Amino acid sequence: MYGHTREQFEEHLFSAGELTFALYYGTFGELAGFAFNGVQCVTHGKSRMAAFSGGGFFRPGYNGCGVVAMFFGLRQALRFKFRQPGTALGYLARTSSPVAYCLFTRTMPRVYPCRTCATPAEVDNLVRSIGEGRHYVRTNADSWVVRSDAIPRDASRMSKHDDHPDVRFYSRINPRFCEGDALLVWIPLNAANIFGGLYRQVRLRVFRWSQ
């Protein structure tokens, strides 16, 4: 959200409705950033389900923030499943860079769109419906590419990841991410995906601590 006023930032953040926040602090007690999470109940066909939204904003210089924010989101999803076990749940996000997309593919067992499998028609229709409900603005014929206020500040820093297969996949679908286009990502939050994601999160955090 570099270059936005406080009012623009608040409008972007609270457009998702009521949110839950987690604050994170640095070694000396300074505020490092925060993660947030919201839920939107929708009806798709004859089924009712819940669609999570969320993300995080952290000051430059702090490492592993994306993993921390995702861990918070998965814990919130798990709490929701315990409270409403009969309600289907998923997470829809706008990824504004290939690195953000790769964070999802690295930490979650099932993510759409995926370079190794086709997106089922029912998932495509569901994402289209939720995106319209959130008033996402499509920027081309692909319904998975929408407008975003979160534009990478310095895309050149991501060039070291250009050879990664998921980066190439993302860049092929959304080549204009430096100009404000974002790729939607849908993550089914069933029990297998939630626990698989938590396992990968713990493994990544242990790996970071051991370095």
Per-region residue spans from a language model:
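Conserved acetyl-CoA-binding loop-helix of GNAT-fold acetyltransferases
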Residues: 58, 63-79
